[in-house]
Amino acid sequence: MVRWHPAALAVVIAIGLVACGSGDKSGTEGGARGSRRFGTIASPCGPGRASGATQLGVTDSTITIGFGDDSAAASSPGLNVEMSEAIRAMIDWCNEQGGIEGRRLVGDEHDAAINDVETAMRSACARDFMLVGQGWLLDDAQERTRLACSLATVPTFAVSERFATAPLMVQPSPDPPESVNAAGAFLLAAAYPTKVRRAATMQGNQPTARAETARVVGAFEQAGWQFLPCEQEYNIGGEANWVPFVQRLKDCGAEVVHFSGSMRPTFEEILRAARAIGFDPIWMQEASVYDSDLAAWNSEGLADNVHFQMTYYPFEQADRVPAVADYLDIMRAAGAPAGLLGAQAVAAFLLWAEGAKACGSDLTSDCVMRVLKNVSNYDAGGLQSPTNPGANLPGNCAMVLRVRGTRYEQVLPSDIAIQACDRTYRVSVGR
């Protein structure tokens, strides 16, 4: 391990002095136009006099960071490619301003194609200073290699419990197994106190899906939800007929259903089956709904009762949230697609860049990790609601969106572009 340099201990970084609202757009010039701000925070990028080949991937003039996705997977072409597109765009955005303390950023892309994550990690270990904004589905398989080469990372997300609680890792939107931001569950319980006492779950027949459902139930029960004994488990590869599943939910008296699984075709077929038997519960989905084509698909109104929690501000609120406007401007200038995972990758990049800037000429991965472990209140300039990356804890703020026609709209809280915050919204669950 590289030793921590004492000079960096004196650095105090103010990352995201935040409130639960979206902030004022005044003073933001737009990220794509070379502005020195991103949302409510000063850009961490710019000229400087940092120098020294302090670690693999660092020279007097450059910093090489790895990033990547699973987009070459034969089973899911293009999987999560928006993360890599976002990191490339942010590298260009940062270099246009002078890099990090004068060092130009060099991107090194690694495509794990789902099953080749260990190969991708070996490649990163051989060349990169740190991994930034990557996300691989089988991240459990990377950890022996990553930790053996002491490769620190600020990923977009963590899938496995092993990686989500690993050393040498800080992420902008922590999701550790024992702590849940259940703000959406609390908000729905306040809005529909009777309905949430007749809730049910539906998930695929995989151990990870069962574990996640148990985690959801444990968290939501603390928000006042009560779950009926009619959990539905389906074949992850699909079912020939979805009517029996939704019929059992209807017969059980479920008024709210928490669904976990793929959007297309699984959830769309379930919604169609529910319409066929006149079953219209509140569906509670995951935030990944926002990145799907569900709203565009919903021309018949089958998804009009689908709700989901968001801790990132939706793109429809760009006129009210400066960070969202800046993110969209940067992606547009780069010709890159905008997406929820892309926004989360940008949050990871900005968090990493703050740490790298703080270290200056003493740039090592230990230095960056030490700086980031002291970040307890981070909102990526208002792109998301506040989290505690240093302690690996999620936030306690969120909004609830729903599908209405072919659009997404905020329904809770009623004040648009405001997230509801309460310390009780973050709950502990058993592992």
Q: How would you name each of these model-derived features?
A:
Residues 174-175, 273-346, 414-429:
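Extracellular/periplasmic periplasmic-binding protein-like sensory domains
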Residues 34-52, 56, 376-431:
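Solvent-exposed, acidic/polar segments of extracytosolic/periplasmic ligand-binding ectodomains
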Residues 16-19:
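C-terminal motif of bacterial Sec signal peptides marking the signal peptidase cleavage site
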Residues 21-24:
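Bacterial signal peptide processing site
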Residues 205, 213-217, 263-269, 315-373:
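Extracellular/periplasmic ligand-binding modules, especially the Venus flytrap/periplasmic-binding
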Residues 27-124, 260, 341:
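N-terminal extracellular/periplasmic Venus flytrap/periplasmic-binding protein-like
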Residues 128-232, 282-307:
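Extracytoplasmic ligand/sensor domains, especially the bilobed periplasmic-binding protein
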Residues 78-85, 96-167, 233-243, 264-268:
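Beta-alpha junction/loop-to-helix N-cap segments that form part of ligand/metal-binding clefts
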